[in-house]
Swiss-Prot record:
This is Snake venom serine proteinase 12. GO terms for molecular function: serine-type endopeptidase activity; toxin activity. Disulfide bonds join 31-163, 50-66, 98-258, 142-212, 174-191, 202-227. SUPFAM superfamilies: Trypsin-like serine proteases (SSF50494). Residues 19-24 form a propeptide.
Length: 260
């Protein structure tokens, strides 16, 4: 899946790590066409960029680093080249960030809410994904998916989304994996992957979901440039910690502040 970096650190990150905004799931298989009705594709404006998650008929959640001026959002998409009959396209009406300056970091506030220009209708290939009702537990099996790169180091992208199962790891595993970034001792991000390597999100998967034990718990933020590398898991924005912010904005309270 896609490995995307935080805007504030883009220049540094591009030297050695890949942003997940354009990566595919490594070590996965083609997703069942009925498994990802909530998964949306973000284009800039005609080039595939990131994934996102449909929360209801007019709101999409994704990573802040996926923001571009001319985003187009495709819903109900499976194949990039063969459209579903119920596929729909929207553009943002409004975009909301945890910080108005969009100064997110590698460990904080890489989250963006998009209000669509018009509501979408549920259909065979379009349906929302519920927000989590409880926090995730370390050791959970988590589902990842996206149209990101499917080769660890080559520019190989699929026509359809790929899915894989990984594990939710202790945050300390990511602290040890990326000492050069000086990650804080605690964070509103989740650490997930396979310690032995082989399965991972990659470039192009950014903004996509981490679904643990059936609940939407994370948004892909960033990871190692060589996807699926041993002891190099990826980091995901923790959705549960941002519930009040998300729900308040959807309810119309746009003055709400992000969790500290």
């Amino acid at each position: 899946m896609v490995l995307i970096r935080v805007l504030a650190n883009l220049l540094i990150l591009q030297l050695s790590y890949a942003q997940k905004s354009s990566e595919l799931v490594i070590g996965g298989d083609e997703c069942n066409i009925n498994e990802h009705r909530f998964l949306v594709a973000l284009y800039d404006p005609d080039r595939f960029l990131c994934s996102g998650i449909l929360l209801n008929e007019e709101w999409v959640l994704t990573a802040a680093h996926c923001d571009r001026r001319n985003i187009r959002i495709k819903l109900g998409m499976h194949s990039k080249t063969v459209p579903n009959e119920d596929e729909q396209t929207r553009v943002p009406k409004e975009k909301f960030f945890c910080l108005s300056s969009k100064n997110y970091t590698l460990w904080d506030k890489d989250i963006m809410l998009i209000r669509l220009d018009s509501p979408v209708s549920n259909s065979e290939h379009i349906a929302p994904l519920s927000l989590p009702s409880s926090p995730p537990s370390v050791g959970s099996v988590c589902r990842i998916m996206g149209w990101g790169r499917i080769s660890p180091s080559k520019e190989t992208y699929p026509d359809v989304p790929h899915c894989a199962n990984i594990n939710l790891l202790d945050y300390e595993v990511c602290l040890a994996a990326y000492p050069e970034f000086g990650l804080p001792a605690t964070s509103k991000t989740l650490c997930a992957g396979i310690l032995e390597g082989g399965k991972d999100t990659c470039v192009g998967d950014s903004g996509g979901p981490l679904i643990c034990n059936g609940q939407f718990q994370g948004i892909l933020s960033w990871g190692n440039d060589v996807c699926g590398y041993i002891l190099q898991p990826a980091l995901y924005t923790r959705v549960f910690d941002h519930l009040d912010w998300i729900q308040s904005i959807i309810a119309g309270n746009t003055d709400v502040t992000c969790p500290p």
